Amino acid sequence: MAKVLVLYYSSYGHLEVMAKAIAEGAREAGASVDIKRVPETVPLEIAKGAHFKLDQDAPVAKVEDLADYDAIIVGAPTRFGRMASQMAAFFDAAGGLWARGALHGKVAGAFTSTATQHGGQETTLFSIITNMLHFGTTIVGLDYGHAGQMTLDEITGGSPYGATTIAGGDGSRQPSENELTGARYQGRKIAETAIKLHG
């Protein structure tokens, strides 16, 4: 059975919700799925003052965990058009995995959230995807089999490069059903690819 890791960072819970939807899709495909988050690097008092969601269920990942999976689906919110520093710091600590080729041939994908519709979703996805390509993974995006990313009757996330959500400038907007459907779809497609490649 293919093993899938959904690895995410979320300050306010939007990507926690998306991670759970991605995991649902991967499980529907028949994969064994774990959800983990990267360590918070913001000092606790500052995180509390900024009202970060600190009670997230997912255990904190260790860099070495990545080698145990057939597929790794990575989610991080945008920070000025690139992945949040918490996720970047996690990857920066993974040089040992890169040096020994521990992730070569694994399947990977990316998902993100932004404050606005044009707030850097695709550049953030590319910042994650670039890292995963350097680690030797095979990238699976959100193909147009998820027709919801073509809709024009609502403001919605979704890109061929990965599932996305729009949080709103004050973080009050939660992932829509269309965005969650896209996340489940991408999770399923990545798991199906991992099953084909790794059994």
From Swiss-Prot:
Keywords assigned by UniProt, alphabetized: Flavoprotein, FMN, NAD, NADP, Nucleotide-binding, Oxidoreductase
Annotated GO CC locations: membrane
Keyword Nucleotide-binding in record: yes
Domain Flavodoxin-like per the UniProt entry, residue ranges: 4-190
Cofactor(s) required, per the database record: FMN
Pfam family, one: FMN_red
EC category: oxidoreductase
Entry annotated with the keyword NADP: yes
Coiled-coil intervals: none
Binding positions for FMN per the UniProt entry: 10-15, 78-80, 113-119, 134
Origin: domain of life: Bacteria
List of residues binding substrate: 98
EC number: 1.6.5.2
Cofactor, free-text remark: Binds 1 FMN per monomer.
Residues annotated as binding NAD(+): 12
A molecular-function term among this protein's GO annotations: FMN binding
Family statement: Belongs to the WrbA family.
NCBIfam families referenced in this protein's UniProt entry, alphabetically: flav_wrbA, PRK03767.1
Name the UniProt record assigns to this protein: NAD(P)H dehydrogenase (quinone)
